[in-house]
Amino acid sequence: MAAESDVLHFQFEQQGDVVLQKMNLLRQQNLFCDVSIYINDTEFQGHKVILAACSTFMRDQFLLTQSKHVRITILQSAEVGWKLLLSCYTGALEVKRKELLKYLTAASYLQMVHIVEKCTEALSKYLEIDLSMKNNQHTDLCQSSDTDVKNEEENSDKDCEIIEISEDSPVNLDFHVKEEESNALQSAAETLTSERMRMQSPELSAVDGGFKENEICILHVESISTDDVENGQFSQPCTSSKAGIYFPETQHSLINSTVENRVTEVPGNTNQGLFSENSDGSHGTVNEIQNLDENFSLRHQCPRCPRGFLHVENYLRHLKMHKLFLCLQCGKTFTQKKNLNRHIRGHMGIRPFQCTVCLKTFTAKSTLQDHLNIHSGDRPYKCHCCDMDFKHKSALKKHLTSVHGRSSGEKLSRPDLKRQNLL
C-alpha cells in the first residue's frame, strides 16, 4: 500500500493540441516530412502518420505503396484539397457557404469522416433555413388568396336572399331570385359548356373520369420505357389509349405532397402531350403552369419509386429507406458503399491499387487481382459448361455468351450438361 501511494499520476490535457501545433511547425519548416501529396499539381508536404490518422483514403494509399510521392486528382480546385489536408494539422477548417458542397464532396472522397459530418450538418441547417423562408413566402401568398376568396364570398352574400322555412310552409317553395341574374348565370353556363365540348378532343374525353377541376389525378404512361426516359426521347405524345388514371399505394405520400404544394412535376419532354384545364375552361400545356413558379420543381427523382424531392437532405434521407448510396457529383445511386467509393475514384481519376510487379495502377481491387493472374499464371474462373478456365472474369462472361449463349448466372440442366460433354 505504501508503494502505491508513492506513485504520482500526471494528465496533460493540452498534449494533443500542443503536439499538432509543433508538427505543423515542423511541416512548415519541411522537417521530418516523409511524403509529398500532389493535388492537381499543387504540392503538400506532410507526415504519413498524421495524414493516415485523419484520412482513411490516405492510409490505404500509404499501405499500398511505399512511395514518397502520392498524386491526387480531384474535380474541385486544388485549394479545397490543400485546406482539407491542412486541417489534419490545425484541427480547424474555414468554408465559404457557397463552397460547402465542394468541401463535402472532396472530404467524402478522401474519407475524412469528421469533416463530412460537419459539412452535412451545416448543409442541412442552411437548407432548412431556405425551406422555411420559401414556406413563409408560400404562406403569405395563400393568406392573400384566402383574403380575396373571403371578399368574393362577402360580395356574393350581398346578392343572396335569406329565406326562413317554418313548419307551416308548403313543401314546394318558390325561391325568388333576381330574374336578370338567373338569366346571366344560365347563359354563362351554356357558353362554358359549349366551349368545353368544342375544345375537348375525343382522346381527352376518355381520360376524364368525372373529376372536379380542383381534384388531382396522376396519369401513368405505360408506353414509355426506361431507356426512353434516360435518353429523354419519346416516340409519341400521351393519349387516352396509353394513359390511365390510377392511384397506387406507393404514391400516396406523393399525392399528399402534391395536394399541399399544388404543383405538378413532369420530367423531360413528357409534358408535350399532357394538358391541364384552366379555371376558365380553356386547356393549356403543363409548361405554362410550370413557368408560373419554377422554384417548386422537384430536382431529385428517386430511382426506386415515383417520389421526387426539392432538397438534397430529404432526398438522402429517403434513399436510406431503399438502402441506396448517392454520388454527390453526378447523382448516380449504388446499392453498396464500396461501389460508390470506386465510382468516386473514377470521377477523381485516382487509381489507388498498384501492381507490385509492373507498377500498373487500377481503380478497383478486383481488377488488380485479375491483373495479378497474368503474372502468376492462375486461371481461377472456370466454365460450368465445359472444362475451359480463364484468368479474367470478363473473359469467362464473354465465353459463356458467345459459345454457350447464356449468362454467367445461368446454370445448365443435366440433359444440357450431357449434351455439352458429348460435344
From Swiss-Prot:
Localization: Nucleus
Span of domain BTB: 33-97
Pfam families per record: BTB (PF00651), zf-C2H2 (PF00096)
Presence of keyword Kinase: no
Disulfide bond positions: none
GO molecular function, one term: zinc ion binding
Single GO cellular component term: mitochondrion
Primary site of residence: nucleus
Cross-referenced InterPro entries: BTB/POZ_dom (IPR000210), SKP1/BTB/POZ_sf (IPR011333), Znf_C2H2_sf (IPR036236), Znf_C2H2_type (IPR013087), ZnFinger_BTB_dom_contain (IPR050457)
Zinc finger (C2H2-type): 300-322, 325-347, 353-375, 381-404
Keyword terms, alphabetized: DNA-binding, Metal-binding, Nucleus, Phosphoprotein, Repeat, Transcription, Transcription regulation, Zinc, Zinc-finger
Functional description taken from the UniProt entry: May be involved in transcriptional regulation.
Protein name: Zinc finger and BTB domain-containing protein 6
Species this chain originates from: Mus musculus
Gene giving rise to this polypeptide: Zbtb6
